[in-house]
A protein has these predicted regions:
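Non-catalytic DNA-recognition/assembly elements of restriction-modification systems
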Residues: 1-31, 35-36, 62-91, 211, ...
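Non-catalytic, well-ordered alpha-helical scaffold segments
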Residues: 21-25, 100-103, 140, 178-182
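Short histidine
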Residues: 33-56, 60
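Low-complexity, Lys/Gly-biased intrinsically disordered segments
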Residues: 77-114, 131, 149, 205
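A short beta-sheet element
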Residues: 107-108, 124-186, 195-198, 203-205, ...
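Cytochrome P450 core scaffold surrounding the K-helix E-X-X-R motif
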Residues: 115-119
Length: 243
């Protein structure tokens, strides 16, 4: 009898975990299509944000990107990662080149969804030019190039660190809500828009990343969306933590 009850509890737990996962996916769907928070007609149109970066900016045509099957609000705009971010990968380990200063760096094994595992940190030499290219500062968005392609987290620490060549570092060209774009990558990953047929199966190259088409809301709505997702996800995480 007790075994049956325990089995039923375990089944209910698995069903609830699956429901929470599905709910999170739905929240992201609504967020990325502009349906999670109310549209404010007084918000500055997103195209003005893009024109502050590049006065000659023209919205992207997403019609050729067959996996994107949702519309966006009128005051949003389709752009590319390259329109919004400066980005590059880190340094490849090269034991035959010892030039530079020994510095801590992270690899894809340190980078997980929305967190970092920093118990094991390696070092390698970086020249001055490599430091500028590979340094990660607080607020930078880091993306896995290979392995679990598109896995992402924001570096929120008060100290800098370096990255190796299988991590993309994204840094906004102007003031943006990086957390909105973090959730955008999570949404794209769930829908196989990165790491699947949407881009390259074997990895996310710098070129693929640069040309990745994304929906961009106004700056205010970026923050509103990110804070709403944070709130909903934290409540769902509390439910699963109590199982």
């Amino acid at each position: 009898k007790w075994n049956i009850i325990i089995d039923e509890i375990e089944d209910d737990k698995l069903e609830l975990e699956a429901y929470v996962k599905k709910t999170k996916s739905k929240i992201l769907d609504l967020a990325i299509s502009g349906k999670l928070v109310p549209q404010d007609p007084n918000d500055e149109p997103a195209i003005e944000l893009l024109k502050r970066i590049n006065p000659d900016f023209e919205p992207c045509d997403n019609s050729h990107y067959e996996n994107i099957e949702f519309d966006i609000p009128q005051n949003w705009v389709w752009a590319t990662i390259g329109d919004i971010f400066e980005h590059n990968t880190g340094k490849a380990l090269n034991a035959s080149n010892p030039n530079g200063t020994m510095l801590d760096y992270i690899t894809t094994s340190n980078l997980y969804w929305d967190r970092f595992e920093l118990s094991i940190i390696k070092q390698m030499p970086f020249t001055e030019s490599e430091i500028e290219r590979c340094i990660v500062r607080k607020g930078d968005l880091l993306i896995c190039e290979g392995g679990d392609v598109g896995r992402a987290a924001i570096w929120e620490y008060d100290y800098n660190i370096m990255i190796q060549n299988h991590i993309h570092r994204l840094r906004g060209k102007v003031d943006i809500c990086t957390r909105y774009f973090f959730y955008l990558f999570m949404h794209y990953k769930l829908h196989n828009l990165i790491g699947g047929k949407g881009v390259a199966i074997q990895g996310l190259s710098s070129r693929d990343l640069h040309n990745l088409i994304i929906p961009v809301p106004s700056l205010k709505e970026q923050y509103d969306i990110a804070s709403s997702i944070d709130l909903y996800f934290s409540k769902l995480d509390m439910i699963t933590a109590e199982l």
